[in-house]
Amino acid sequence: MTQLLKAKEGVITREMEVVAAEERKSPEEIRQKVALGEVVIPANVNHQNLHPKGIGAGLKVKVNANLGTSENRCFYEDELKKVKVAIKAGADAIMDLSTGGNLDEIRRAIIKESSVPVGTVPLYQAAAETLNKYGDISRLDPELLFDVIEKQAADGVDFMTVHVGVTREILKVLDRFPRVTEVVSRGGSLTIAWMEKNGRENPLYEQFDRLLAICRKYDVTLSLGDGLRPGSIADATDQLQIMELMKLGELVKYAQNQGVQVMVEGPGHVPINQIEMNVKLMKRLCANAPFYVLGPLVTDIAPGYDHITAAIGGAWAAYFGADFLCYVTPAEHLGLPTVEDVEEGVIALKIAAHAADLARGNREAWNRDYEMSVARKELNWERQFELAINPERARKMRIERGSQDIKSCSMCGELCAMKIMNERGGKNA
């Protein structure tokens, strides 16, 4: 029985109790939000070492880290290092997007290594296997896709992205609304290509009940993918994006009524002035289900720095109600991220999540900032390092800048404002 079905029956699960303790909420409040579909707890019954996380309304903003192999770069040990680094940096979830090598082996290793929820996009494995076998993705057999979904669920995958909103209905009008970057979602483009070449409906949409049955069996949370998300500022909030969102809104309630936990994915590339509208529209159309956003990136001109453009957009989106931020690394649009890129991406989006929690009135976030300010006033460096989002980097920079032997730092030295005011006897200026 899924977390959602148990919540609807009034049962408080161990996972709900863990989430309640972390969020400083009552278990009953968490149960109620899960029952309403406003909070999800991705927790596959087969993920043995999982520390459950709650995602959704009224909870702290969570951050996901994408990783995985590609056909060009396939080093298993690197991906496992990324898992460790991402979790250490504060990632609340991991997605394995591998497309190269032994996909079953790497996924199982990641699940075994990860104490946080693990997500996948099953279509990637089905497409990769089809391409390797036939050299033509259009020959993908829907039965293979569902076999992959069942296998991944049995392995312990906690949430799955499925692009069920990309349908033949939308395909009919696709070319009526031209875009600068067309379709940038891998899952969306694969689905469109398959439907066009086979003249058939998206199998995940056509057999949605079959998909739900698998999810219900293992308590896999569905993440309804945004296959038509805008891939450029010029395409943000266009007709295709909204058409897909409306379809996803229909499927949210249907899935929830079948006892399956569900969240909804969102854009993409969105200018700052459109972020509030995007979040509120999604929440309205999708019954306040948890909203999972990729950034969003607020400008297109920063390759090499897109963890920053994503953090800016993520802070805004989360402030207006987004619940789950997918990180973006400095390597976005350029190549597969390194271990160092993963750490940078997680920390950038953790800063965004914390900034949003702070603005949303989260007492724990406010207390942490307050304590940091007190430590700075007291020139208490050890306490500052403890409270820092990346203690190791803060400590290293202080040492490298020649500050470790002085009470203040090498920026101001004896002219340190804090030092001067402290020597004044604690009076307020």
UniProtKB/Swiss-Prot annotation:
Cofactors named for this entry: [4Fe-4S] cluster
Name of the protein: Phosphomethylpyrimidine synthase
Keyword Zinc attributed: yes
Family: Belongs to the ThiC family.
Reactions it catalyzes: 5-amino-1-(5-phospho-beta-D-ribosyl)imidazole + S-adenosyl-L-methionine = 4-amino-2-methyl-5-(phosphooxymethyl)pyrimidine + CO + 5'-deoxyadenosine + formate + L-methionine + 3 H(+)
Gene coding for it: thiC
Binding-site positions, Zn(2+): 269, 333
InterPro entries named among the record's database cross-references: ThiC, ThiC/Bza_core_dom, ThiC/BzaA/B
UniProt xrefs under Pfam families: ThiC_Rad_SAM (PF01964)
